Regions:
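Glycine-rich, acidic loop regions that bind phosphate or pyrophosphate groups
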Residues: 1-54
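Generic enzyme active-site microenvironment
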Residues: 7, 97, 150-151
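An acidic- and aromatic-residue-enriched active-site/binding cleft used to recognize and process polar
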Residues: 10, 101, 152-154
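Thiamine diphosphate
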Residues: 15-18, 24-26, 30-36, 106-190
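Active-site diphosphate/adenylate-binding microenvironment
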Residues: 54-138
Length: 190
């Protein structure tokens, strides 16, 4: 709540869109970050070993917390639990695709990726319906691999017709539909 936020975005309309920003910077993030790094490296105000030690201690304290913990329910199956089970069942070796929404956040946080290039999603581009076509592409590229599309009921409806493609090419990909009966992320931000 007391964070001082610097928001770098190439699109001025996005600055401060979701949270209050203390320092807005319009520009290409890669260019701006290079400039900031150069400015910091050129500064005489460099942290000393003691300050860095304290910082690393703080980081270790944060890492020791179970910040992704959640309470199990006897009433419903929690989406976090589903994604953790997916990781357990696949041994963490699946290619996982996702669209945009709360299911994307849960997949990113709870799958526990340990292999490179296994998390296929559109990032912050807001592309509902990305997950299933991406899973089809990954399955075609890696026919022997386990491919799972973690999606939500609104996202999967953007491209549900692609199930016929899965049938046509006999693709064994898995679809994990985390149905919360809402466009959850839209509702969350409203």
């Amino acid at each position: 709540p007391h964070a001082r936020i610097i928001h770098i975005d190439i699109d001025p309309a996005s600055i401060g869109k979701n949270v209050r920003v203390e320092i807005p910077i319009v520009g290409d993030a890669s260019v701006v970050l290079e400039q900031l790094v150069s400015a910091i490296r050129g500064s005489a105000d460099q942290p000393d070993a003691e300050s860095l030690g304290k910082w690393w201690e703080q980081i270790k304290q944060w890492q020791s917390r179970d910040s992704l913990g959640f309470e199990m329910s006897t009433e419903v199956i929690k989406p976090q639990f589903v994604v953790q089970k997916l990781h357990e069942i696949t041994g963490g070796d699946a290619f996982v695709t996702s669209d945009v929404g709360q299911h994307q956040m849960w997949a990113a946080q709870y799958y526990g990726f340990s292999n490179p290039r296994r998390w296929i999603n559109s990032g912050g581009l807001g592309t509902m319906g990305f997950g299933l076509p991406a899973a089809i592409g990954v399955q075609l590229a890696h026919p022997e691999a386990t491919v799972a599309c973690v999606t939500g009921e609104a996202s999967i409806m953007m491209c549900i017709q692609e199930l016929s493609t899965c049938k046509q090419y006999d693709l064994p990909l898995k679809i994990v539909n985390l149905n919360n009966r809402y466009m959850g992320m839209v509702r969350q931000w409203q």
